[in-house]
C-alpha cells in the first residue's frame, strides 16, 4: 500500500479533513484495539536482554540499518547477539533460524539482510522465537519491529522516527500513519533515533516539540559506496521509495527515470524483464536498494546494481551509554 498524501498534512486542504473525519471512527477502533492488546497481554521474560527497534508509524523509517548496526557492534564485543523478526512477507511462521538457502518468499526480505551479519530467527510468536534463540545460545536478542508487540518483555526500546515525515498528521491508521496513539508509544520508548535524510537537515519545530522530554539520538543513512557511473534507472519497493531516489541523486547518481513499487513488492520475472527493457531505452543500468535486491528472482540479480547504506549516529556516546548495562550483563566473563 502506498501511503495517502493527506497522512503528511496536519491542516489545510491537503489534510483532507472530510476524509479524515469519515475515517476517524475506524481509527478509534484500531487505536483502542492496539492499546487493549498491549495492556492485557502478559509479556514473557525470556531471561535475556531484549533490545527492541521499532517505530510509531506505518512504512519505512530506517529500522533495518539500526538493527544491523546493533547486531554487528554487539558481536564485535564477543557477545552472541541474534536478530528476531516476524518475517513479514515470508510464508514461514517459525520459530526457525534463517539459512543461506532461504528466499524472501520463505522468510521475508529483512531477515535475509540481517542474516548477512548475524544469526536471525523468524517467528510469528516473538516469545516462541526468543525461547528458541536462547536454547541455541543467544545472549542478547535484537528484535526488529516489535514496539507494538507485547509478547516479549523488553529491556531497551529504540523508537526510530523519520525526521522528514515525523508522525504525519498525528492520527491513527487509517486516518493517519500512526500504529497507535502517539503518547503511549513515546512513553514506552527509552530513546528516539531520529533518522535524518542528510547530516545538515533542519528538524521541524513541531516534531521537536513532540519529542520534548525524550532522549533523542540524531542519525542518518550513509551509502557504503558511491553510485555507479553512467545513467541509472532506479526502482524500489520500500516504505518510502523517494528517500532512496533522493539519496541517490544527492550522492551524484545520474538517474534518468525512477519506478516506485509497493513496500515489500514481490518481483516477478516479467517485472524485471520490463525494467531491463525500459532501462535500455535510456542506455541506463538498473539500480535498487539492498532490501529490494534480495527479493529479485535469482537469475536477474547479477544484472542489477544494489546500493547498500549503513546508519551513522551523531551522538554515539548517548547510544553507548544506553547499551552499557546490557553489554555488561551479556559480555563473556574473563
Regions found by a protein language model. Give the residues of each.
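Short, flexible loop segments at boundaries between secondary-structure elements
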Residues: 262-265, 302-332
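C-terminal accessory "lid"/substrate-recognition subdomains
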Residues: 1-13, 166-285, 332-334
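Hydrophobic residues at beta-strand termini and immediately following loops
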Residues: 53, 84, 121, 161, ...
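Residue-level signal for inorganic ion chemistry
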Residues: 29, 64, 114, 144, ...
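Phosphate/Mg2+-binding loops and adjacent switch elements
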Residues: 87-211
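A transmembrane-helix-recognition feature enriched in membrane-embedded lipid enzymes
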Residues: 2-49
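Walker A (P-loop) phosphate-binding motif
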Residues: 35-100
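Conserved beta-strand elements of the Class I
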Residues: 80-84, 159, 231-235
Amino acid at each position: 500500500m502506498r501511503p495517502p498524501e493527506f497522512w503528511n498534512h496536519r491542516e489545510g486542504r491537503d489534510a483532507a479533513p472530510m476524509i479524515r473525519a469519515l475515517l476517524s471512527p475506524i481509527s478509534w477502533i484500531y487505536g483502542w484495539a492496539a492499546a487493549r492488546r498491549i495492556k492485557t497481554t502478559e509479556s514473557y521474560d525470556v531471561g535475556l536482554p531484549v533490545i527492541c527497534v521499532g517505530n510509531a508509524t506505518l512504512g519505512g523509517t530506517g529500522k533495518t540499518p539500526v538493527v544491523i548496526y546493533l547486531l554487528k557492534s554487539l558481536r564485535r564485543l564477543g557477545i552472541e547477539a541474534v536478530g528476531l523478526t516476524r518475517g513479514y512477507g515470508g510464508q514461514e511462521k517459525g520459530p526457525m533460524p534463517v539459512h543461506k538457502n532461504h528466499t524472501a518468499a520463505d522468510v521475508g526480505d529483512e531477515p535475509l539482510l540481517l542474516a548477512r551479519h548475524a544469526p536471525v530467527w523468524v517467528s510469528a510468536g516473538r516469545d516462541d522465537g526468543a525461547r528458541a534463540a536462547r536454547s541455541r545460545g543467544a545472549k542478547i536478542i535484537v528484535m526488529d519491529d516489535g514496539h507494538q508487540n507485547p509478547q516479549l518483555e523488553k529491556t531497551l526500546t529504540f523508537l526510530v522516527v523519520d525526521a522528514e515525515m515525523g508522525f504525519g498528521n498525528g492520527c491513527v491508521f487509517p486516518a493517519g500513519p500512526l500504529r497507535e496513539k502517539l503518547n503511549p508509544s513515546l512513553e514506552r520508548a527509552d530513546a528516539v533515533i531520529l533518522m535524518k535524510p542528510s547530516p545538515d537537515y533542519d528538524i521541524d519545530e513541531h516534531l521537536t516539540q513532540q519529542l520534548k522530554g525524550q532522549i533523542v539520538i540524531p542519525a542518518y543513512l550513509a551509502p557504503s559506496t558511491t553510485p555507479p557511473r553512467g545513467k541509472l534507472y532506479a526502482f524500489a519497493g520500500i516504505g518510502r521509495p523517494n528517500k532512496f531516489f533522493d539519496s541517490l541523486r544527492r550522492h551524484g547518481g545520474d538517474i534518468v527515470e525512477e519506478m516506485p513499487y509497493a513496500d515489500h513488492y514481490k518481483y516477478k520475472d516479467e517485472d524485471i524483464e520490463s525494467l531491463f527493457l525500459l532501462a535500455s531505452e535510456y542506455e541506463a543500468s538498473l539500480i535498487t536498494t539492498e532490501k529490494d535486491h534480495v527479493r529479485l528472482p535469482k537469475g536477474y540479480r547479477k544484472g542489477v546494481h544494489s546500493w547498500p547504506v549503513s546508519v551513522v549516529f551523531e551522538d554515539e556516546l548517548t547510544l553507548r551509554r544506553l547499551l552499557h548495562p546490557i553489554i555488561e550483563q551479556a559480555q563473556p566473563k574473563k
